[in-house]
Design a protein with these regions (language model features):
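Extracytoplasmic metal-acquisition and chelation regions
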Residues: 1-169
């Protein structure tokens, strides 16, 4: 799977939000751990196989959930969800650009998009200040919804985020 890039040309670091890309990481970790510690190769391979099965399962659950959303477009404050969008046939639009708050021009473009596409929700992460997201939601007559891409339980969190997005979209 290729990395995503931002308009500025930088690489999108939010790769962990793609179960299919995480599978590549799990396989690489198991391979390297087995090479470094051959006595436990079987354990690493079994643990990897178990986790890969969980990733396949959650990928299918997310795919099924997001297939039925009314809108295939969503707006976020911080552009962390591009891999989710790419993997599941959605389009992410972000207020923040290159780590900076949106300019007045970009905000207006996003307001126009939200109104044209009837997007009534903006997702934001618990790690960021939500004031611009809240002001944006007020402008479009919508609401903000918090997602937690850094939550501790990865599999459960992916399911929770997909359920939240499905309900909101």
């Amino acid at each position: 799977y290729p990395d995503r890039t931002f308009e500025s040309g930088g690489r999108d670091p939010h790769i962990w939000l793609s179960p299919m890309r995480v599978k590549v990481m799990v396989e690489a970790i198991a391979r390297e751990m087995s090479a470094l510690d051959p006595d436990n190769k079987e354990l690493y391979e079994q643990n990897a196989a178990d986790y890969l099965a969980q990733l396949d399962e959650v990928d299918q659950e997310i795919k099924t959930a997001l297939e039925g959303v009314a809108s295939k477009q969503f707006i976020v404050y911080h552009p962390a969800f591009g891999y989710i969008a790419e993997d599941y046939g959605l389009t992410m639009h972000a207020l923040e650009q290159d780590g900076k708050e949106a300019t007045a021009q970009h905000l207006q473009e996003m307001v126009d998009l939200a109104k044209a596409e009837d997007i009534k929700v903006i997702f934001y992460q618990e790690e960021v200040d939500s004031s611009q997201a809240e002001a944006f939601a007020e402008e479009i007559g919508g609401k903000t919804i918090q997602l937690a891409p850094l939550a501790a339980d990865y599999i459960t969190n992916l399911k929770n985020m997909a359920a939240t997005m499905t309900e909101a979209m």
